[in-house]
UniProtKB/Swiss-Prot annotation:
Keywords: ATP-binding, Cytoplasm, Kinase, Magnesium, Metal-binding, Nucleotide biosynthesis, Nucleotide-binding, Transferase
Residues holding Mg(2+): D152, H154, D167
Cell compartments where the protein resides: Cytoplasm
CDD domains the UniProt entry points to: PRTases_typeI
SUPFAM superfamilies: PRTase-like
Pathway annotation from the record: Metabolic intermediate biosynthesis; 5-phospho-alpha-D-ribose 1-diphosphate biosynthesis; 5-phospho-alpha-D-ribose 1-diphosphate from D-ribose 5-phosphate (route I): step 1/1
A GO MF term: ribose phosphate diphosphokinase activity
PROSITE patterns found in the cross-reference section: PRPP_SYNTHASE (PS00114), PUR_PYR_PR_TRANSFER (PS00103)
Protein name: Ribose-phosphate pyrophosphokinase 5
Length: 341
C-alpha cells in the first residue's frame, strides 16, 4: 500500500511484526535507545514525508518508558512532515485509573439515628486521585497524534477525553468466534460476568450466541463486608467467564470458585487483555478455571497448552489500519459475525 508506514515501540515487537505481515509491509525502520541517564532517544531511519504513519505500542511491561517512546516517535514523525500519525494502542495506558475525588466513606448512609452524623477529624486536606486518563489523552494529542486505535477500553468514557477520532475496537467478535469453534457443547453454556461493570460486554456475547447470561453481584453494604450474589443459573452447565482484563487474577479466580460452588460443571475464562503480574499464572493454574483464553494485545509469557490458549488480534488491527488508510468504513469490525484470521 502506497505511503503507509507502520512503526512499533519496544513494548510488543511480535504484534507489530504480525500486523505488518498481514499488511504485506516491512516494519518501519526506527532506532530506539537510551542515554546513560535513562532518557529515551528516537531516530526515524526512513522518510515519512507525506506518509500515513501508524505506531503500535500497547501498554505493557515498562509502561512509562514505552509511553515516552510513543510520544517521542509521534512528535518525530510529525516533525518529519508525516501527513497523518495514528497511535495504535491495543492496551490503552492508564485506562484503569479513575478520574474522581478519593473518598474514604464508601457507600452513603442508609439511615440516621438521633439526627447525629459521626464525623472524623478533618485535617483540612482532601486527597485526590490524579486525572491520569485525561493527562495521557492530552499528552497524545500534544505530541501530534491525529487518530487513536485501541481495543476494549476499560472505561469507554475515555474516548471523551480526546479531541481527535478514537476507534475503540471490540474483542467480542474474537471471543464469540473462539467459543463457537473451541468449546464443546457450548450451547449448554452460560455467559457469566464477574462484576456489574462487565455486564454489557458479557450480555453482548450471550445475545450473539443465543446463550443464557448470569451476573456475579457484589453487595458492599453487607454488615460483614462485601458479599457475592449470583443472578442467574449455572447448575450443571458450562460457565464462561468474560472480562476485559486479568492482572493479579484475584477477581477472576474468586468468580470461578463462586460459580463452581453454585454447581457449574466446567469453567472457561475469556479475557481480552492479559497482564498476569506477580504469581497470577500459578494462581490460575491452582484455581478451578479449566481453561483461560486471552488475546495477545499485550506480550504473553504463557504458551498455548491444556490450561491456556491465545487469540491473535493482529488480523483485526491490520484490517482496521488497511480500512482507515484507504478511507473505508470500519463498522464491519464491530460485527459479531465478522472475524479476521
Amino acid at each position: 500500500m502506497k505511503n503507509l508506514v507502520v512503526f512499533g515501540t519496544e513494548s510488543h515487537p511480535k504484534l507489530t511484526e504480525s500486523i505488518c505481515e498481514h499488511l504485506c509491509l516491512d516494519i518501519g525502520r526506527v532506532e530506539l535507545s537510551k542515554f546513560s541517564n535513562g532518557e529515551t532517544s528516537v531516530r526515524i531511519k526512513q522518510s515519512v514525508r507525506g506518509c500515513d504513519v501508524y505506531i503500535v505500542s500497547p501498554a505493557s511491561g515498562q509502561v512509562n518508558d514505552h509511553l515516552m517512546e510513543l510520544l517521542i516517535m509521534i512528535s518525530a514523525c510529525k516533525t518529519a512532515s508525516a501527513k497523518k500519525v495514528t497511535a495504535v494502542l491495543p492496551v490503552f495506558p492508564y485506562s484503569r485509573q479513575p478520574d474522581q475525588k478519593f473518598s474514604f466513606s464508601g457507600a452513603p448512609l442508609s439511615d440516621l439515628q438521633d439526627a447525629v452524623v459521626p464525623c472524623k477529624k478533618q485535617t483540612g486536606y482532601h486527597p485526590w486521585i490524579a486525572q491520569s486518563g485525561t493527562l495521557v489523552a492530552d499528552l497524545l494529542m500534544c505530541s501530534g497524534a491525529d487518530h487513536i486505535i485501541t481495543m476494549d477500553l476499560h472505561d469507554p468514557q475515555f474516548q471523551g477525553f480526546f479531541d481527535i477520532p478514537v476507534d475503540n475496537l471490540f474483542g467480542r467478535p474474537l471471543l464469540k468466534h473462539y467459543i463457537s469453534l473451541n468449546i464443546p457443547n457450548y450451547h449448554n453454556a452460560v455467559i457469566v460476568s464477574p462484576d456489574a461493570g462487565g455486564a454489557k460486554r458479557a450480555t453482548a456475547i450471550a445475545d450473539a450466541l443465543g446463550l443464557d447470561f448470569a451476573l456475579i453481584h457484589k453487595n458492599r453494604r453487607h454488615e460483614y463486608g462485601t458479599s457475592l450474589m449470583l443472578v442467574g443459573d449455572v447448575q450443571n452447565k458450562v460457565a464462561i467467564l468474560i472480562d476485559d482484563l486479568i492482572d493479579t487474577a484475584y477477581t477472576l479466580v474468586r468468580a470461578a470458585e463462586f460459580v463452581k460452588e453454585h454447581g457449574a460443571s466446567k469453567i472457561y475464562a475469556l479475557v481480552t487483555h492479559c497482564v498476569l503480574s506477580g504469581d497470577a499464572i500459578e494462581r490460575v493454574k491452582l484455581s478451578c478455571i479449566d481453561k483461560l483464553i486471552v488475546t495477545n494485545t499485550a506480550p504473553q509469557t504463557i504458551t498455548p497448552s491444556g490450561c491456556f490458549d491465545i487469540i491473535d488480534v493482529a488480523p483485526t488491527f491490520a484490517e482496521a489500519i488497511r480500512r482507515i488508510h484507504n478511507g473505508e468504513s470500519i463498522s464491519i469490525l464491530y460485527d459479531h459475525n465478522q472475524v479476521w484470521v
